[in-house]
């Protein structure tokens, strides 16, 4: 208390809720005022908390009177704030007293805490008083609009360019080139298509937004002491993390192990995090590599927590440049890092030696079995030796139930049993701190030593069943995880993508658990890549899409699902509609319109409960109400015949709701509902998880049709996201300040083209299927519909693109151009269209943050991919639709991190593919056409330089787009394969002969001919 005041009197006003407990009239205050020691003990405090007034006020028998202040001034230094001029109204200055003293004042009580704690009677467990006071409600996230100074000119330029394109096309149609109608007709058709495709691509970009998450508010709301959570235990929902892999030789197990380690060490409540790996190949190599990773995680995860390591992928951490001690405060960091680095090197040696170890073990044990069989055969058993198979053996001396090194019936890649192995059990619900002496080399005192649960899964595969590639594996993981952990949210990763920002998951939860988050089906993170060449020759970073298109879609109904780094709401994956108290309508999907509650009742259940969730939820009557509102919850024809799985659906829906801590939260759960510990796994639960990943489980169900990942397309990710948007769900694009996740991308030209081919083929499949956006429901917003329509249409642009790339060559060969003359009107329109395009590019760079070089690389690879992979995708898609020929793709090989002298060796490796032929043809034809055009103009008596200028500039512009392709074919130091020269020569000879045949030379130099 300030030294300015010698004494004071606290008197309470006679409010209706502050009346004397007896019938006695209010007593006057004593002359000396109310002292803290004179007040009675609080009715709910301990003996040491005697500094709190009685339940309804201070004074004798709770007398209530006007609050007054009696003070005596004491001289004080002029710098003391308490000497400020007092209010002349005579009212009590509440703020002043709250500032000057440590007392807490209110109607009916005053509190002097000791050391800012309450309830500490010497036995510990003290709780701060402010923790027991209800905190003001805070949003967990907010939208950050693009500044109008950027967005308004951007939209205006889109309108200007649209008008310019319209006028240009009108002029082109009304001014044909009568000397070359065929050339004019081809160009007109191409230009109309380009204008249409530009409109489809540009319109969804009109409303880009940014978002920001408040991690401090998330911690305060879910992990801080409160009246409903006095101990501050985490109230966050559970999260199931999926890792997908299929071939340990194309996807190195060391890469997968590093991904697993980064997930196990992420910053999320350990008891709420559950990690699964789906090994679709059923390989023992993957199984034993994950076992090695789990053993190393026992020291790696506590090390990351102790020293706040970033990133938590050990390979990326130890290979990153810079000072590793920067920002580290603990004196033992250098010693710990040196020891853990040595342990990681030994871990890598063990993992890399596993293939040889497994094979040597198999050879030794198979030799033993054959010896025993020969002994039995010698004893009279004639069939003993014939029954011995070349098995693959586990470390405990038993047969591996998955795929063997030498495939045999029931042990082949497409024919093996289900495997579920919980390698790390559920951690203890309470924090388990390390102690001095727990580890011989690391001091883990006061470090949480727990590790999240981890399970290895390999679904059953049998001949005669369609396994539906990655989508089938994801659905198997969804069902198994629902039985084992049933986290209401799921995060999926490819095996080569790892967590680069350990706070990224928390940022995603800010959106899912915020007000209105129950209508969000998934949070998509941008894909970031490492190991890309500095010039990004083949646009691997794809920043134009991830930072431009996807950010713009976030302002509509949400970004598309792009395969990895996506956090899902489990309930949305199950095919249910979102809770719909309002409908979003309008061009941008921002207009809120209330709807009939009966229309949205099917997706707004009351509550749920059950064993699988492990949380405190509603009773049996709530489950019965939920089942009544959701007849599909118990429909085996939709979800299968697992009763345990069906019961888990209501629990997952309930636990995924936001907190009911604000009147505007219409579909929430009470705070503190997820504080109870989870029951341990038992044998029956694990057996049920094995059952739901059997190959027959999906028979006569809607898995892959309306439930889970959707089957029937090689781009199952886009289709799955489209289905959820089509039901009215929204999605969010989460761009974190530090990259959330990182992965690898193919830097080899052939691998990159095959990757683009797979994506484009999936888009063609979407276009010819019922997932075409033209057939979408009215819940899909207009501009979002245009974006999905563009996904299905963009490969067809290749048909027009390759014709347009050949137009300059045809112009130079024929001596004509797409217009009769280079009319000023034509040049003006062309200039206006080009200028508006460049201005749009500059503004897009401004609001998206991409660089001009990245934009130009994207344009170049759009032409390269459009005339190769996209063209092949259209042909393959048409063959599938017309002839029913199925399309299969090989798994893209992931490069393991190695200490190589040249990290970009793959960039210079040339692997011939038929996809090279169309771009080679375009390049060769344009070069020959340039030579022909220049020769004709030079040797003509009346040179027509305008036609040469138009065709020549056009041809140079085409060749500029193919520069990365040509550079890639050169290899390194002239190591171009012979087949490239062969094809280039064949194309040149063919084009030359074709031109001579179509336009034979004559003696008329005046007509532009060349004397021969």
UniProtKB/Swiss-Prot annotation:
Glycosyltransferase in keyword set: yes
Basic and acidic residues: compositionally biased ranges: 57-69
CC per GO annotation: Golgi membrane
Segments of this protein annotated with the region Disordered: 1-85, 597-620
Active site: 280, 717
Enzyme class: transferase
Assigned protein family: Belongs to the glycosyltransferase 2 family. Plant cellulose synthase-like D subfamily.
Name of the molecule in the record: Putative cellulose synthase-like protein D5
